Swiss-Prot record:
InterPro entries noted in UniProt: IGF-I, Insulin-like, Insulin-like_growth_factor, Insulin-like_sf, Insulin_CS
Annotated disulfide bonds: 19-28
Gene3D superfamilies: Insulin-like
Region (C): 1-8
Family listed: Belongs to the insulin family.
Biological source species: Xenopus laevis
Protein name: Insulin-like growth factor 1.L
A as annotated region, ranges: 9-29
Protein task: The insulin-like growth factors, isolated from plasma, are structurally and functionally related to insulin but have a much higher growth-promoting activity. Acts as a ligand for IGF1R. Binds to the alpha subunit of IGF1R, leading to the activation of the intrinsic tyrosine kinase activity which autophosphorylates tyrosine residues in the beta subunit thus initiatiating a cascade of down-stream signaling events leading to activation of the PI3K-AKT/PKB and the Ras-MAPK pathways. Binds to integrins.
Tissue specificity comment: Expressed in adult liver.
Pfam families in the cross-refs: Insulin (PF00049)
Biological process annotations from GO: cell population proliferation; head morphogenesis; insulin-like growth factor receptor signaling pathway; negative regulation of apoptotic process; negative regulation of release of cytochrome c from mitochondria; negative regulation of Wnt signaling pathway; positive regulation of cell population proliferation; positive regulation of phosphatidylinositol 3-kinase/protein kinase B signal transduction
Keyword Disulfide bond part of the UniProt annotation: yes
Length: 44
């Protein structure tokens, strides 16, 4: 009696059953360019 059966989230995809890294990555924000917050702070 799961009403959200059609809407599977990251837990359904990768915790209750295994998934590959590429599928796991789809849930994450894209990688940012190499500049870190530390280097930006040092310039001020």
């Amino acid at each position: 009696n799961n009403r959200r059966a059609h809407h599977r989230g990251i837990v359904d995809e990768c915790c209750f059953q295994s998934c590959d890294f590429r599928r796991l990555e789809m849930y994450c924000a894209p990688a940012k360019p190499a500049k870190s917050a530390r280097s930006v702070r040092a310039q001020r």
